[in-house]
Regions:
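A glycine- and small-residue-enriched flexible loop/hinge signal that marks low-structured segments
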Residues: 2-58, 62, 66-341, 352, ...
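C-terminal hydrophobic structural anchor segments
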Residues: 346-369
């Protein structure tokens, strides 16, 4: 039998390269807001809307509610992707009922005309909800997500395709809303920035903070004072909105490993309540707030957030601890999509492990780990 010999070099191309692990986009913001006078086409109720250039749509955000101030605060810090869910403003819907039918003011003849059942088995009508109900949302009778739950479907929406990683409901963040946002954040591997609702002084904020222990949360106190071009006056703007914008800017410029603290906030004039701070003072308001895991605001070459902690006091005590864990988990997991359901061969296992090692080495080299 003859033999065929080749005296040279053969080159074969292969596409079976090791899987590259890329960082997920951690700078996408998700905001729940009210604005009954906003453009209804651009901002439909209870549906996520993607904004790629926030400054271009400020004129359509209305002047009522919280939407304009939230978007203005973000736009002053960064140009990034923002997913907005607009919800009804309860103050313009009338007071919520507490057990009396919405026809309780009608005469008996009118009740009969409208076919109202006044028997003991009749269910009362609740035409209006509280603001917390609108903001938190859930699912309606048709199975559609409403309120903050609409953020869960943003990534699967053909018109959006992004997952919010920084979420807030500026100006609407009551205790119930903040706790619900943390539930959404856990599902999305996102991080929540929220104010200390209705707290007028440091002691109030410290008392309020005792109600939380979520690792996906940073509590902020007080709020900012900024100029409102719509009204022509200096007004209170929610700190949570600025935190979202600044967080996205830091992610763009430095990375998710850098905390929110000690970075100048753009285009603010003051703070809504006085805070005593001195760099070397251990008994200052700022240090007392920080000791209770509340991020405050100081004035030093401009205004800056001051504080790094979450209300979780055992493992994920810092904002960057939580966000690093989130980004690493999602970056590694998303890169393995093609290997799911593939044969568990030694080559595939080696590919997965080598890609993870290479990614971790790269993060250490770049100073992110």
């Amino acid at each position: 039998m003859s033999e065929t010999r080749f005296h040279g070099a053969r080159v074969r191309e292969s596409t079976g390269l090791a899987t590259a692990i890329n960082d997920v986009d951690s700078s996408v913001i998700g905001i729940v807001a009210t604005a009954d006078d906003a453009d209804e086409t651009l901002f439909p109720l209870n549906k996520p809307t993607l904004l790629t250039r926030v400054s271009d749509v400020l004129g359509k955000a209305g002047t009522k509610g919280t939407l304009y101030k939230s978007l203005k605060a973000v736009a002053d810090q960064v140009s990034t992707k923002v997913i907005v869910v607009r919800v009804p403003d309860a103050s313009s819907q009338g007071a919520p009922d507490t057990g009396v039918t919405s026809f309780g003011h009608l005469d008996p003849e009118d009740r009969a005309f409208f076919g109202i059942d006044e028997s003991e088995d009749a269910h009362p009508v609740y035409p209006h909800k509280t603001q917390d109900q609108y903001v938190i949302g859930g699912t309606d009778g048709d199975g559609n997500y409403t309120g903050m739950y609409a953020l869960l479907i943003a990534e699967q929406d053909d018109a959006i395709g992004y997952r919010p990683r920084i979420i807030a409901a500026p100006g609407l963040d009551t205790e119930a809303v903040t706790k619900s946002l943390c539930v959404i954040a856990e599902k999305l591997r996102a991080f929540v920035y929220a104010g200390c609702h209705n707290c007028k002084k440091p002691a109030d904020a410290i008392s309020y903070r005792a109600r939380f222990n979520e690792r996906e949360l940073m509590l902020l106190w007080p709020d900012f004072i900024a100029y409102n071009p719509k009204s022509g006056a200096n007004e209170v703007f929610p700190a949570a909105a600025y935190a979202c914008g600044l967080r996205a800017r830091i992610d763009h410029e430095q990375g998710w490993h850098k905390s929110l603290s000690n970075v100048p906030v753009t285009n603010v004039l003051g703070i809504s309540s006085p805070v005593f701070w001195s760099l070397q003072s251990e008994d200052s308001d700022a240090n007392n707030l920080n000791n209770k895991e509340i991020t405050t605001i100081i004035r030093r070459n401009g205004f800056r957030f001051w504080g790094n902690r979450t209300p979780e006091t055992k493992a994920y005590i810092f904002e960057v601890y939580t966000r690093t864990a989130q980004v690493l988990a999602d970056s590694v997991a998303e890169a393995q999509f093609e290997t799911i359901d593939a044969p568990l061969t030694p080559a595939n296992v080696k590919d997965v492990l080598s890609a993870i090692r290479a990614k971790l080495d790269a993060l250490v080299t770049s100073g992110r780990l």
